[in-house]
């Protein structure tokens, strides 16, 4: 048994249609998350809120989930088909958040 550390979980976060404005106006981020723990979308949202959400959290987070009007695609698939908050992130997953909320 080697004493190798668990490799980080590398994923890509993308933000579109205005969602990036809540995250320092950065549209794409590559993350290396602690590979020793299981990462679900619920855990990812908590991490995002604590670490990279810079503006008006209420426009992105509502309770433990994203607020209505934020679309979440995981590898181009609607997260509703993948279990939403329960989805377990896999290496090289691409998670895209799109805001459908636009001011008038």
Swiss-Prot record:
There is a cross-link at residue 104 (Glycyl lysine isopeptide (Gly-Lys) (interchain with K-? in acceptor proteins)). Keywords: Cytoplasm, Isopeptide bond, tRNA processing, Ubl conjugation pathway. Pathway: tRNA modification; 5-methoxycarbonylmethyl-2-thiouridine-tRNA biosynthesis. C-terminal thiocarboxylation occurs in 2 steps, it is first acyl-adenylated (-COAMP) via the hesA/moeB/thiF part of the MOCS3 homolog, then thiocarboxylated (-COSH) via the rhodanese domain of the MOCS3 homolog. It is found in: Cytoplasm. SUPFAM superfamilies: MoaD/ThiS. It holds the Pfam family Urm1. The keyword Membrane does not apply. The keyword Cell membrane does not apply. One of its GO terms (cellular component) is cytosol. It comes from the Eukaryota. The modification 1-thioglycine is found at residue 104. GO terms for biological process: negative regulation of JNK cascade; protein urmylation; tRNA thio-modification; tRNA wobble uridine modification. Its main location: cytoplasm. Belongs to the URM1 family. PANTHER family: RURM1 PROTEIN. Acts as a sulfur carrier required for 2-thiolation of mcm(5)S(2)U at tRNA wobble positions of cytosolic tRNA(Lys), tRNA(Glu) and tRNA(Gln). Serves as sulfur donor in tRNA 2-thiolation reaction by being thiocarboxylated (-COSH) at its C-terminus by MOCS3. The sulfur is then transferred to tRNA to form 2-thiolation of mcm(5)S(2)U. Also acts as a ubiquitin-like protein (UBL) that is covalently conjugated via an isopeptide bond to lysine residues of target proteins such as Prx2/Jafrac1, Ciao1, Eip71CD and GILT1. Interacts with cer. This is Ubiquitin-related modifier 1 homolog.
């Amino acid at each position: 048994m080697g004493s190798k550390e668990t490799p980080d979980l590398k994923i890509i976060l993308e933000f579109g249609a205005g969602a990036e404005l809540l995250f320092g106006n950065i549209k794409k981020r590559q993350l290396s998350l602690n590979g020793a723990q299981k990462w679900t979308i619920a855990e990812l949202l908590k991490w995002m809120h604590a670490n990279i959400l810079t503006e008006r959290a209420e426009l992105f987070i509502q309770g433990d989930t994203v607020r209505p009007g934020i679309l979440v695609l995981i590898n181009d698939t609607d997260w509703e088909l993948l279990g939403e908050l329960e989805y377990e992130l896999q290496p090289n997953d691409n998670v895209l958040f799109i805001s459908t909320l636009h001011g008038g």
